[in-house]
Amino acid sequence: MAKITRALISVSDKTGIVEFSRELAGYGVEILSTGGTAKLLREAGLKVKDVSEFTGFPEMLDGRVKTLHPKVHGGLLGMRGNPEHVATMKAHGIEPIDMVVVNLYPFEATVAKPDCTLEDAIENIDIGGPTMLRSAAKNNADVTVVVDHNDYRLVLDEMKAAGGGVSKETNFRLAVKVYQHTAAYDGAISNWLGARTGEGVAAYPDTLTLQFKKAQGMRYGENPHQSAAFYVERDVKEASVATARQLQGKELSYNNIGDTDAALECVKQFAEGPGCVIVKHANPCGVAIGDTLLDAYDRAYKTDPESAFGGIIAFNGELDEATAKAIVERQFVEVIIAPKVSAKASEVVAAKKNVRLLECGTWQKEPMPRLDFKRVNGGLLVQYTDLALHGELKVVTKRAPTEKEMIDLLFTWRVAKFVKSNAIVYGKDGMTIGVGAGQMSRVNSARIAAIKAEHAGLPVAGSVMASDAFFPFRDGLDNAAAVGITAVIQPGGSMRDEEVIAAADEHGMAMVFTSMRHFRH
């Protein structure tokens, strides 16, 4: 490999750049630079040649044109092993540039500011930086290109081991990273500007560019005959299954990740006390809050012990020794996830070496808006995640719910939001009594919820019921009354609302409309 003799350095993020440049200088590397980077390096006592001196052409247009010059791009793109390239470079006085260290104007950080104007955004679109990066990356056989300060040490270590050069294999990997970076950069620009082609700002741009990074290969997907991988967003800003740290256990499977996400996002809804959610096939089969985490787990498990077998368990507080012990002694579990796991709890779970134990960190009270995607053949459905809980709450029956009933209604309503439609949830005293999920008719979901409660030995009488969407007929209310439901919460909005309200009044039930539906498919 050839020794690096000249590097062009121009960075917006100056993390570690002085130290990196100092070590390059120690190998005799000539440093070319521009603007603020050159100033910083000189102040650190390093010898720097301005790019304008190197090219013989001044910076102009308020700094918009600095490096867009044949002496720069010829020095990057010229193939050292091509005699014609070498002769052309020599004829035009073009000297080779062996390394480019560039990161780009902070476009995403700029447009994230609430007071960002179109002019601000435009001025933070980097032109020279991506051009140099792409030129260097294209000629990676001869040029080392560094776009991430986390790679400085990798490059220096290799130069030290190789006497001042970097291997072609490393150059190739760094070049791939450049194209990933510039693709994301251009995608962010396209998305932001594409939402502003008409009047005002559109919720969705004309074209949508997404980038996810491969986090994990998988043995198979949803089924053994399907291949799969797990990709994560570049910058996840909240606690999630994508950011969770695995403390022990087998590698997470495709289904594990989907179910763990469902469990974690559901348990985040409950901030009033220790909470537990048990999920099977992306549906909550038991949800509870309690005086302690152990109490919450006990109550969630009692909803449906049969379905909890092989399930995913999520908590909203630190997993403690007592709760961990109860889980491993009571049931087979695929995944346990919590914001934090105590050392004692980790020791307990370690007895079951295949159990996947995840620590996700704490989350903020108000969730961050984000996009949801659903792939269809030939397209992509895009919507904002369902983060709202309810609209205006309206008591529509003669009898208003008691204070206790209202607490239980809001509890079951939060659970119903995470149950596959058609969803019916029976609950009482901060725990689910029965869950009816995924049925084509709403009344059948209600029947299943009652069957589940009976099978678990839990009395339905005195419980409340939540429905993710309106009741199209009164039969759902009649069925609920027959098993002892005393209050109902649902969106309302059916053509037969009056008939449904009349049924509730006949049975002496209280009913609340939420003015918001929560279909989940």
Curated annotation (Swiss-Prot):
PROSITE patterns on file: MGS
Gene Ontology MF term list: IMP cyclohydrolase activity; phosphoribosylaminoimidazolecarboxamide formyltransferase activity
Catalytic activity: (6R)-10-formyltetrahydrofolate + 5-amino-1-(5-phospho-beta-D-ribosyl)imidazole-4-carboxamide = 5-formamido-1-(5-phospho-D-ribosyl)imidazole-4-carboxamide + (6S)-5,6,7,8-tetrahydrofolate; IMP + H2O = 5-formamido-1-(5-phospho-D-ribosyl)imidazole-4-carboxamide
Residue ranges of every copy of the MGS-like domain listed in the record: 1-147
A single GO BP: 'de novo' IMP biosynthetic process
InterPro entries referenced in this protein's UniProt entry, alphabetically: AICAR_Tfase_dup_dom_sf (IPR024051), Cytidine_deaminase-like (IPR016193), MGS-like_dom (IPR011607), MGS-like_dom_sf (IPR036914), PurH-like (IPR002695)
Transferase found in the keyword field: yes
Biological pathway: Purine metabolism; IMP biosynthesis via de novo pathway; 5-formamido-1-(5-phospho-D-ribosyl)imidazole-4-carboxamide from 5-amino-1-(5-phospho-D-ribosyl)imidazole-4-carboxamide (10-formyl THF route): step 1/1; Purine metabolism; IMP biosynthesis via de novo pathway; IMP from 5-formamido-1-(5-phospho-D-ribosyl)imidazole-4-carboxamide: step 1/1
GO terms under cellular component: cytosol
SMART domains linked: AICARFT_IMPCHas (SM00798), MGS (SM00851)
EC number: 2.1.2.3, 3.5.4.10
Recorded superkingdom: Bacteria
Sorted UniProt keywords: Hydrolase, Multifunctional enzyme, Purine biosynthesis, Transferase
Entry's free-text remark on domains: The IMP cyclohydrolase activity resides in the N-terminal region.
Family: Belongs to the PurH family.
NCBIfam families per record: PRK00881.1 (NF002049), purH (TIGR00355)
UniProt protein name: Bifunctional purine biosynthesis protein PurH
Organism of derivation: Geotalea uraniireducens (strain Rf4)
